[in-house]
Curated annotation (Swiss-Prot):
One CC-aspect GO term: photosystem I
Pfam family for this entry, one: Fer4_7
GO molecular function: 4 iron, 4 sulfur cluster binding; electron transfer activity; metal ion binding; oxidoreductase activity
Main location: plastid
Official protein name in the record: Photosystem I iron-sulfur center
InterPro entries documented for this protein: 4Fe4S_Fe-S-bd, 4Fe4S_Fe_S_CS, PSI_iron-sulfur_center, PSI_PsaC
Naturally occurring in which organism (per UniProt): Gnetum gnemon
Regions annotated as coiled coil: none
Gene that encodes the chain: psaC
Quaternary organization: The eukaryotic PSI reaction center is composed of at least 11 subunits.
Residues the entry annotates as binding [4Fe-4S] cluster 2: 21, 48, 51, 54
Amino acid sequence: MAHSVKIYDTCIGCTQCVRACPTDVLEMVPWNGCRAKQIASAPRTEDCVGCKRCESACPTDYLSVRVYLRNEVTRSMGLAY
């Protein structure tokens, strides 16, 4: 089941989320916005199982990576039945 994965620009490029993902949804891509010169990217969200291990692994205080489960996205859009 695909979930929405959002990467925020608060990412510090540490790769913790990439290593924590059991389904390889995340990868690092070049980015000049942080010291590490890389940022997490989520090119394979269709493989996301919603375990949120990437969120747990994120060392920043403001969660640079967030997983929105399918029902959370639907509810926030006012489409829940």
